[in-house]
């Protein structure tokens, strides 16, 4: 059956990933990673969760492994953020069980949005006014690190209040990537990102050796980053698929309200085939 075929495809994908030799990237382009988690990151067994009569999750089981980059797809209000909280043990399922693997260290992008000091400089916000920060276990000058996020050297002492929306989001990413983690949780991370910052985010995530759980309506983002998707298919039914948004759309067996498009200008440009990855300096 098609369901059995999907399960076999997911198992094949995970076996191939487990057998791959781990890649080591340029430290300057790496997210700050904690010690590796165990191979199993999250296991859900026949999980049920509801708010009153509103069924969010009905009998869902999955195993998320180290290195998985899982996209979560569903209509607005379907419970995607709730699912994240259940998977991470922040909300207890009403039936079934959740098991977190050993050594899991989680960093949340959405929780950083209000953590910028408007009166402080970029240097203050990243390094508490110090010249040096630790990235990938090595000391780096904060100016060089900020240049990786497309800030020119003369902006290092600028106050956060002077930043544009795109610059502010790049600073948030710089803060996120300094947090030691082996699991990244991204709830609508592409909202309000300009194209340049979005491409920067994708490059960083592709290089990240840990596990990623991401809620997004951005089809191109999911296609470029996700190795699998969990899809809300109505009435609490969730299904897991190999690949990103387009792969799900080809494999789906139940009609689902399609995700809304990202803002028009970046989306139109990014619907073209992905360009070759560029290096930042």
Where are these regions (language model features)?
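Intracellular alpha-helical coupling/juxtamembrane segments of multi-pass membrane proteins
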Residues: 3-9, 13-21
């Amino acid at each position: 059956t098609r369901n059995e075929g999907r399960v076999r495809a997911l198992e094949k994908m995970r076996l191939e990933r487990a057998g791959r030799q781990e890649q080591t990237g340029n430290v300057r382009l790496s997210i700050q990673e904690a010690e590796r988690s165990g191979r199993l990151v999250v296991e859900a067994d026949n999980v049920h969760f509801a708010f009153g009569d509103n069924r969010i999750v009905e009998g869902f089981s999955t195993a998320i492994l180290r290195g998985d980059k899982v996209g979560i797809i569903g209509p607005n209000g379907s419970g995607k953020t709730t699912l994240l909280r259940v998977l991470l043990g922040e909300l207890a399922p009403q039936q079934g069980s959740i098991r977190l693997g050993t050594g899991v260290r989680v960093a949340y992008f959405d929780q950083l949005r209000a953590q910028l000091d408007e009166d402080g400089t970029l240097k203050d916000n990243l390094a508490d006014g110090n010249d040096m920060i630790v990235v990938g276990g090595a000391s780096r000058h904060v100016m060089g690190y900020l240049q990786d996020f497309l800030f020119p050297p003369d902006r290092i002492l600028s106050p956060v209040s002077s930043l544009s929306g795109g610059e502010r989001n790049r600073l948030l990413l710089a803060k996120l990537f300094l947090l030691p983690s082996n699991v990244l949780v991204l709830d609508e991370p592409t909202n309000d990102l300009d194209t340049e910052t979005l491409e920067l985010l994708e490059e960083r995530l592709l290089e990240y050796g840990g596990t990623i759980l991401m809620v997004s309506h951005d089809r191109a983002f999911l296609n470029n980053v996700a190795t699998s998707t969990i899809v809300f298919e109505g009435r609490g039914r969730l299904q897991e698929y190999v690949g990103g948004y387009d792969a799900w759309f080809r494999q789906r067996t139940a009609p689902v309200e399609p995700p809304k498009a990202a803002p028009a200008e970046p989306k139109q440009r990014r619907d073209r085939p992905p360009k070759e990855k560029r290096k930042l300096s």
